[in-house]
């Protein structure tokens, strides 16, 4: 299992475009991929769950990944977040 913390830098917070791209990448993964925010969890495979948190600029969240090719999925998700200036590198 991999768990990593990120801080939102986008002034709009976790908005629809990056959330949909993260969901698209996560759906391809056969294992468990969850976003943890303020003690709550949502599957990264559900855009509704992610958007429901309303994560704002400056707030942090964790990604928790468990299954085959965890490191590759983390890399893919980080590329999406970095390319869209969603989180700090």
Functional labels for PLM-detected ranges:
Residues 54-89:
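C-terminal structural segments of small proteins and small subunits
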Residues 1-5, 60-62:
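Intrinsic-disorder/low-complexity, polar/charged segments enriched in Ser/Thr/Lys/Arg/Asp/Glu/Gln
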Residues 7-57, 65:
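Compact, glycine-rich, soluble single-domain proteins
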């Amino acid at each position: 299992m991999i768990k990593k913390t990120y801080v939102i830098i986008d002034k709009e917070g976790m908005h629809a475009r990056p959330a949909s791209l993260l969901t698209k990448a996560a759906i391809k993964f056969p294992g468990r991929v969850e976003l943890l925010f303020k003690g709550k969890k949502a599957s990264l495979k559900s855009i509704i769950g992610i958007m429901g948190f309303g994560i704002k600029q400056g707030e942090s969240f964790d990604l928790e990944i468990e299954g085959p090719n965890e490191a590759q999925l983390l890399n893919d998700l980080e590329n999406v977040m970095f390319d869209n200036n969603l989180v700090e590198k």
